Amino acid sequence: MREVTIERNTNETQIELTLNLDGAGRYQVDTGCGFLNHMLELFARHGRFDLVLTCHGDVEVDYHHTAEDVGIALGQAFAAALGEMRGIRRYGNFYLPMDEALVLCAVDLSGRATLNWDVHCKTEKVGDFDVECVSEFWLGFARNVPATVHFVQFAGENTHHILEACFKGAGRALAEAVRIDAAHRDEIPSTKGLLV
């Protein structure tokens, strides 16, 4: 079973996270930020990952450190759960329609950290959550797997719908990328023999 628990503690956030890549989409998330909780719950559900996460952050300042550090911790958890990435499919992508919004998420668990964030929301906030924190979350994630992650928005007017499509699409794309390829269970999916 590919399941890990990690802790990440800084002067800004204290995070405990348990991730099971072979789960059923169960979640228990408390980041101190309702919108981020909602997005992570959608991510876990649509990726079929079991996720238990608590974060105590300096939310009296804003949600920036919480979003960034949770992304870092989630990336670290994926890295630990995947190990040397033997037998995985490596690549995954998903077009996610959410009402009028349409977003592509494409992932390569390459060992190389890249985020392409081609998402354009028309508002700067959803409730009291700064929209720019979402790209910081995914940058922290990509750097710590490490992985190449692309988000490309094709349509969308409603900021909540656009960001929801991003998190659901990422869950679906990552579910495909981490899936074990039964025909190549013992192989590392790279001609180099190593994913770095």
Explain the meaning of each model-derived region:
Residues M1-V196:
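N-terminal intrinsically disordered, cationic/polar leader segments
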